[in-house]
Amino acid sequence: MEAVHFGAGNIGRGFIGETLAANGFKINFVDVNETIINALNQRGEYTITLAAPGEKKIHVDNVDGLNNAKDPEAVVKAIAQADLVTTAIGPKILPIIAPLIAQGLQARDAANNHQALDVIACENMIGGSQSLKKSVYEHLDDAGKTFADTYVGFPNAAVDRIVPQQKHDDPLAVSVEDFKEWVVDESQMKNKDLKLKTVDYVPDLEPYIERKLFSVNTGHATTAYTGKYLGYTTIGDAIKDPKVFNQAKGALAETRSLLLSEFKNFDEKDLENYQNRVLQRFQNPYISDDISRVARTPIRKLGYDERFIRPIRELKERGLNYSVLMDTVGMMFHYVEPNDAEAVKLQAMLKDQPLVDVIKEVTGLKDAGLIDEVEASVKSKDR
């Protein structure tokens, strides 16, 4: 079996590539990074190191690289005969690869390849595959859309694996945590006969995406912003401080109450165990993560539907507690990082505009009560 995977970065090689290889796929990695593509073609293999006791090595072979900037025709040809297409390139890049995927689907149609194909976006976003589908369909004519409707699925997925910041002399070397989770919405699949080992297939993905967003993303960001406020530079050092650990644990207790209220299929004890495992992952001494990486783009992370404001809104609607989340939001407005364009912009806005105006603009909140609470939280963190 052959897979085409867009994105030969650390997540692509260290998570998606590992899973595809373990399921017997030959993997065609697609990327514009010439160094990585050349190395894949020269060696046809690479090694993953688990960031865990023993630092186990995982060997991945039967791989090659395709440069979509220099040889798009080769990518189209690969999609035309692929058994599976996956991505791990970042949400903003999905629309950029959409024309190439559309050409690949047209080539499948021209070759009368009627084998069902799923295109799975493994991105840190909600509805990634369906978003990619929308972009792909913009580049298909009516006949192409009919072919895709019949034979091509775009099942949404939730993926979770921490890949720490790292530098290697070998461009293909990659280190990842031993925990991994990949969940696919089975209801959106076209090729239901192709199920990957270690991947979970579920009838409704939403609870799993929300669980990950409000546990891993909210918890990691809480650790980062609290740690930064208290003077730390790495997640590992920050989480050792009981103040930071308890802030993260408290934030997750609040999001847990929201998840249990929203989704009846979650068991409280199971969810608590899941979130405790999340906190243990942040404590992993083999993962050195800079706070500046985890806390980057604070304006985006303060957004209306993002990891803090959304649970705060929904907890308030349900009459549930959100005091730790609100306290963390106060610290986010004090985040200073000269190398982060959004952090610089946020501090400039706070200097030039009234605080309440910045809160409204950044969070999108209309609820006057919540705006007042955010304002009070920010002011309580003034030094």
UniProtKB/Swiss-Prot annotation:
Catalytic reaction(s) noted: D-mannitol 1-phosphate + NAD(+) = beta-D-fructose 6-phosphate + NADH + H(+)
GO terms for cellular component: cytosol
UniProt-listed GO biological process terms: mannitol catabolic process
Binding site for NAD(+): A3, V4, H5, F6, G7, A8, G9, N10, I11, G12, R13, G14
Keyword NAD tagged: yes
Keywords: NAD, Oxidoreductase
EC id: 1.1.1.17
Metal-binding among keywords: no
InterPro entries in the record: 6-PGluconate_DH-like_C_sf, 6PGD_dom2, Mannitol_1_phos_5_DH, Mannitol_DH, Mannitol_DH_C, Mannitol_DH_CS, Mannitol_DH_N, NAD(P)-bd_dom_sf
Pfam families: Mannitol_dh, Mannitol_dh_C
GO molecular function, one term: mannitol-1-phosphate 5-dehydrogenase activity
Gene3D superfamilies from the UniProt entry: N-(1-d-carboxylethyl)-l-norvaline Dehydrogenase, domain 2, NAD(P)-binding Rossmann-like Domain
Domain of life: Bacteria
NCBIfam families referenced in this protein's UniProt entry, alphabetically: PRK02318.1-2, PRK02318.1-3, PRK02318.2-5
Database matches in PANTHER family: ALTRONATE OXIDOREDUCTASE-RELATED, MANNITOL-1-PHOSPHATE 5-DEHYDROGENASE
Family according to the record: Belongs to the mannitol dehydrogenase family.
HAMAP family registered for this protein in UniProt: Mannitol_dehydrog (MF_00196)
Name by which UniProt lists this protein: Mannitol-1-phosphate 5-dehydrogenase
Organism of origin: Lacticaseibacillus casei (strain BL23) (Lactobacillus casei)
Lineage start: Bacteria, Bacillati, Bacillota, Bacilli, Lactobacillales
